[in-house]
């Protein structure tokens, strides 16, 4: 019991440190600056001209129970994917497409336990490529959705998720990885891996 409590305290402290350092870490793998001289021509310019309008008829159902232990999801290059509509292989195929590809509806992407992004049906929100961002309260008994939405989701430390992810080049569908165009995360890999491996929902 003592060790269990101690582990929970350590987990909470490390997760707090992770978010404070990162500002916004929503579902991005560790990134690094582009080694090429190409401009970061992500979705920022074109997205700014689009209205932030949600079509509820195009929503994928997302509840607290949609978010599970990270080790129950499919690992892809240091982050984790799933699909709430049962199309896991399509999501994995998009994640593994060398030239980039749009993720299918129902896709869920997570880097760390307490933040996620979910892809709704086409037309849900053109500004975010139909992605919705989530901040979660994660405990042993499960996850609770604390904050959710399109462009206005800001975590408790002031990081705007969409503003981070819109810097990804168009072919990457707002997914941040090394070379995708997003700002690098000032977090060592070991800290991200430690946080992933200490998801309190996992046995």
Regions found by a protein language model. Give the residues of each.
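Bacterial N-terminal signal peptides that target proteins for export
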Residues: 2-14
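Intrinsic-disorder/low-complexity peptide segments enriched for small residues
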Residues: 11-17, 41, 48
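C-terminal motif of bacterial Sec signal peptides marking the signal peptidase cleavage site
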Residues: 20-23
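N-terminal secretory signal peptides
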Residues: 38-105
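Sequence context surrounding c-type heme c attachment/ligation sites in exported
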Residues: 28-31, 55-56, 70, 76-77, ...
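Bacterial Sec signal peptide processing site at the extreme N-terminus
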Residues: 25-37
């Amino acid at each position: 019991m003592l060790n269990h409590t101690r582990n929970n305290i350590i987990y909470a402290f490390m997760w707090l440190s992770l978010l404070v350092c990162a500002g916004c870490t929503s579902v991005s793998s560790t990134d690094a600056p582009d080694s090429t001289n190409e401009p970061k021509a992500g979705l920022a310019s074109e997205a700014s001209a689009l209205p932030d309008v949600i079509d509820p008829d195009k929503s994928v159902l997302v509840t607290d129970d949609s978010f599970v232990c990270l080790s129950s999801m499919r690992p892809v290059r240091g982050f984790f994917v799933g699909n709430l509509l049962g199309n896991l292989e399509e999501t994995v195929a998009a994640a593994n497409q060398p030239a980039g590809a749009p993720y299918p509806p129902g896709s869920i992407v997570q880097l760390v336990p307490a933040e996620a992004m979910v892809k709704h049906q086409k037309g849900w929100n053109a500004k975010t490529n139909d992605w919705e961002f989530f901040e979660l309260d994660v405990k042993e008994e499960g996850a609770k959705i604390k904050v959710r939405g399109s462009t206005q989701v800001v975590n408790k430390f002031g990081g705007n998720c969409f503003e981070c992810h819109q810097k990804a080049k168009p072919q990457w569908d707002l997914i941040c990885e090394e070379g995708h165009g997003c700002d690098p995360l000032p977090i060592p890999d070991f800290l991200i891996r430690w946080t992933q491996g200490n998801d309190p929902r996992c046995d």
